[in-house]
């Protein structure tokens, strides 16, 4: 299997796939390898664990690291998992199965997704084959899963570690499942892509159409109730909170969903309808209903949303400061402008004067 870090293993032998191994009852400590000087024997715990029947390819797809074995995020995830297994022994089997028994982030993430999304007719082994085979062949997805987990770690104070994001945060997991479904959609495997969309919606409560186009470094905070329509486009470094709807209007085909610019911040329960553009670095306050274009680096709020100010920050999605208080406007917003970037006048009700 093509992995960014670690040695390739052969999981295709019939003996390894005949049955799933029983989980041993003894809790192993990551300190064991320090005492003996040998590498920690993960295979003694999980020699095979619902890995599927992956067929390695002759030309592995690797990220363009100077040293292809160097993957700092995956290295951090493994170190975090070792410490967490020692701090909470009851989770040691779960951590070894989900992270420490795998060779790379792609394989571990495929395992987690497969086991979260499986059902009696979509088996974990089948799903892991699907996820892994897509991830290890696509450089863009390999980059995205790392930039996304970095976004969660940097922007969500509730995200304690990289490992907690890939194991527990449904916004991150739903986003990565979408990325695989999107690739399948572009390959013409639309029925499978829609089946994955349906399972993600059932399990995580997040509905992202596989034809939507979403950039890298995305934070899908909480994720509950997020709906992203078929022709929606989302740029890079965007932060989206729970309950956001990027919906269409009417029943005509073609572009009928919003286009969200780079670095935008969409607050909780925002609804944006139709083929309208949210400019780069724009902020949409929680609970807003947006029915027309929003200028870049502006802030809108209300139902329907109205322009209430501008922001100096390049990417407000990175700071997550979306409370429209007087202190916020005095310190972050540009308090008084006669015109908005397209040259239109700003009405008096849309101005925030400094005192």
Swiss-Prot record:
It comes from Arabidopsis thaliana. The keyword Chloroplast does not apply. It holds the Pfam family Hexapep. InterPro entries: Hexapep (IPR001451), Hexapep_transf_CS (IPR018357), LbH_SAT (IPR045304), Ser_AcTrfase_N (IPR010493), Ser_AcTrfase_N_sf (IPR042122), Ser_O-AcTrfase (IPR005881), Serine_acetyltransferase (IPR053376), Trimer_LpxA-like_sf (IPR011004). Keywords: Acyltransferase, Amino-acid biosynthesis, Cytoplasm, Transferase. One of its GO terms (biological process) is sulfate assimilation. Feedback inhibitions by L-Ser and acetyl-CoA. Homomultimer. This is Serine acetyltransferase 4. It is found in: Cytoplasm. Localized in vascular tissues, particularly in phloem. GO terms for cellular component: cytosol. It comes from the Eukaryota. It catalyses: L-serine + acetyl-CoA = O-acetyl-L-serine + CoA. Pathway: Amino-acid biosynthesis; L-cysteine biosynthesis; L-cysteine from L-serine: step 1/2.
């Amino acid at each position: 299997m093509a992995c960014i870090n670690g040695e390739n293993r052969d999981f295709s032998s019939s003996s390894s796939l005949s049955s799933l191994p029983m989980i041993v009852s003894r809790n192993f400590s990551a300190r064991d390898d320090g005492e003996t000087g040998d590498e920690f024997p993960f295979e003694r715990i999980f020699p095979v664990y619902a890995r599927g029947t992956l067929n390695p390819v002759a030309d592995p797809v690797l990220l363009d690291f100077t040293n292809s074995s160097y993957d700092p995020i995956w290295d951090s995830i493994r170190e975090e998992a070792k410490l967490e297994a020692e701090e909470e022994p009851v989770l040691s089997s779960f951590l070894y199965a989900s992270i420490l028994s795998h060779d790379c982030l792609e394989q571990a993430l495929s395992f987690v997704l497969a086991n979260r999304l499986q059902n009696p007719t979509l088996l974990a082994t089948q799903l892991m084959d699907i996820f892994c085979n897509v991830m290890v062949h696509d450089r863009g997805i390999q980059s995205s899963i790392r930039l996304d987990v970095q976004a969660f770690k940097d922007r969500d104070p509730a995200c304690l570690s990289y490992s907690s994001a890939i194991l527990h945060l449904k916004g991150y997991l739903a986003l990565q499942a979408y990325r695989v479904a999107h690739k399948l959609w572009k390959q013409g495997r639309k029925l499978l892509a829609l089946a994955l969309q349906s399972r993600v919606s059932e399990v995580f409560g997040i509905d992202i159409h596989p034809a939507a186009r979403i950039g890298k470094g995305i934070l899908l905070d909480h994720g509950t109730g997020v709906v992203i329509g078929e022709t929606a486009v989302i740029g890079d470094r965007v932060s989206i909170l729970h309950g956001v709807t990027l919906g269409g209007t009417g029943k005509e085909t073609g572009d009928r969903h919003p286009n969200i610019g780079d670095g935008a911040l969409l607050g909780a329960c925002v609804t944006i309808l139709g083929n309208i553009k949210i400019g780069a670095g724009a902020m949409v306050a929680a609970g807003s209903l947006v029915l027309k274009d929003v200028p870049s680096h502006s802030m809108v709020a209300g139902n329907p949303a109205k322009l209430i100010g501008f922001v100096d920050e390049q990417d407000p999605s990175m700071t997550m400061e979306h409370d429209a208080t007087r202190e916020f406007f005095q310190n972050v917003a540009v308090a008084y402008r006669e015109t908005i970037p397209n040259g239109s006048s700003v009405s008096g009700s849309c101005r925030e004067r400094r005192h």
